[in-house]
């Protein structure tokens, strides 16, 4: 399959800057998984995203009941709620390509062998949002990947925690589509990371972000 035919599947973010000469950058949403032998948020999807030269590979992180960080999009795996389940049971679950659900530890170990930027989505947790952020940031530090990681989240609490706990200057974007550019600037967020329909309703936000030195990401 030609790259042109599947890039739209991978389009997660369009990164803009004050310089119109800078080309948009593409992020593989949950990795490059729309291909045989791959699956969403799998190690293979991460490797394939790296192989096609996209800017970054996005992945989703949860904290289990016994405080293990795992990579998965949904809050539930085969009927088991991640936040209230033990890692022992969750890590036995298989992805569509036969891999087991990866821990963040395993995911970052594989990432260390690659060069693609890592776009870590902190999932909204019911009770342990601060603890999840603490453990994610610490693991990224221990793996020596701080300069390659950017964070995104739908959680208002998680956004503030990431900005507070991650090293100063680490890009942290808000996904929820509700905060004004000036509000994000005031808390040192990197910019807006909103669905395309949000920008259709608020087209002026793009210029406002750029005028404030913020970046704009678009997903569909």
PLM feature segments, named:
Residues 18-220:
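Phosphate-group recognition and catalysis centered on beta-loop-alpha active-site segments
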């Amino acid at each position: 399959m030609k790259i042109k035919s599947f890039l739209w599947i991978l389009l997660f973010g369009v990164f803009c800057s004050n310089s119109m000469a800078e080309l948009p950058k593409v992020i593989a949403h949950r990795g490059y998984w729309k291909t045989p032998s791959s699956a969403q948020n799998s190690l293979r999807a991460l490797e394939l995203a790296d192989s096609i030269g996209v800017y970054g590979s996005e992945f989703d992180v949860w904290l289990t009941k016994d405080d293990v960080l795992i990579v998965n999009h949904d809050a539930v795996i085969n009927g088991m709620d991640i936040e209230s389940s033990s890692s022992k049971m969750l890590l036995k679950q298989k992805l569509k390509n036969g891999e087991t659900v990866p821990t963040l530890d395993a995911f970052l170990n594989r990432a260390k062998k690659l060069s693609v930027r890592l776009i870590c989505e902190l999932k909204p947790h019911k009770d342990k949002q601060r603890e999840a952020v603490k453990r994610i940031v610490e693991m990224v530090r221990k793996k020596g990947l701080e300069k390659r990681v950017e964070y995104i989240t739908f959680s208002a609490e998680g956004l503030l925690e990431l900005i507070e706990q991650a090293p100063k200057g680490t890009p942290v974007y808000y996904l929820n589509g509700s905060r004004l550019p000036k509000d994000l600037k005031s808390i040192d967020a990197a910019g807006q990371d909103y669905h395309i329909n949000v920008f259709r309703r608020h087209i002026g936000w793009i210029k406002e972000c750029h005028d404030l030195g913020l970046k704009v990401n678009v997903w569909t």
